[in-house]
Each structure stands twice: as C-alpha cells, then as structure tokens.
C-alpha cells in the first residue's frame, strides 16, 4: 500500500474519473487457453489475478502480455505454454491507492513505482476497481487543459 501525500484542493478524485470497470477478476489457476477466451470476448480488459483463500490480488495480465507469453514463453514453458496458468506469466508489480486520492497522487504512484496495474480501494479498505491507463491519461489531459482545477 502506498501513502498518498497532500491533496490539491478542487483537483478531481480518482473515483470521479473513468469507469473503473475495464477489468476481470480471475483465479490464480486460470489456464492460458481460458485466458485467450476471456481476451477474445473483452480484449481491452486487464485480468486481475486474485487468490480467494488469501483475499489478495497477486498480479495483472493484459492482452499484450498474453502475446508475449506465447511468442516468447518462459523457459519452463518453452514447449508447453498452453499448459501454463496465468500465475506462471502474470505481472506481479501491482499497486493500490485509495479512490479518494487525486489524479496527481495517482500519477506520482505511476512515476515512482511503475506498477503494471493500479487497484482502487474505498474508504473502508475494500476493493473498489481498477484505474486504467486510459482513464488516468484522460484525467491528466483535462488538468492540463484546465489548470484552475488544481488550485480551485
């Protein structure tokens, strides 16, 4: 968990921008052929890898990662990538931020930690969604177009 710093008054909060629904939560043992089926239905989603027993997210996986895994599989799976599960090839560098943080704080998290995915939590610490790159970038562009939001 990353602490968020001081907030610019009037700057949009993360929960106020984007949809936070461009993801699917999947189990650790999801086989890659089933990953392919999920991406066939919703190619723009990120798959968030979750362990129900631990109540913990362990990683993320994008369509781009899927292509990399099949095109250049890890040594262990060189001749049998179709038998691998998502946990074998997922990105483990994920970060969490409160959805009451502002856009600048989210951007600070991106530039310092470079996570593969940013998970959102609500005021009670529960999972509240996912902040997509597109939503963050759109919000940053809006701030650039209207700098008065930062000091409002």
Region annotations inferred by a language model:
Residues 1-22, 62-95, 102-112, 127-152:
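Tandem CBS (Bateman) regulatory domains
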Residues 25-44, 50-51, 95-115, 120-123, ...:
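The conserved cystathionine-beta-synthase
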Residues 49-52, 63:
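Acidic/polar N-terminal loop/beta-strand segments that form early-domain functional surfaces
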């Amino acid at each position: 968990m990353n602490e968020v710093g001081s907030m610019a008054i009037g700057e949009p909060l993360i929960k106020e921008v984007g949809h936070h629904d461009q993801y699917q939560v999947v189990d650790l043992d999801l086989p890659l052929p089933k990953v392919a089926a999920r991406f066939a239905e919703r190619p723009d989603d990120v798959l968030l890898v979750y362990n129900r027993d631990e109540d913990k997210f362990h990683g993320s996986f994008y369509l781009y990662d899927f292509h990399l895994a099949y095109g250049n599989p890890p040594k262990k799976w060189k001749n049998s990538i179709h038998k691998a599960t998502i946990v074998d090839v997922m990105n483990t560098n994920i970060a969490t931020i409160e959805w009451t943080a502002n856009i600048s704080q989210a951007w600070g998290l991106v530039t310092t930690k470079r996570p593969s995915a940013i998970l959102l939590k609500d005021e009670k610490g529960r999972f509240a969604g996912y902040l997509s790159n597109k939503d963050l970038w759109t919000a940053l562009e809006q701030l650039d177009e209207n700098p008065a939001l930062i000091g409002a």
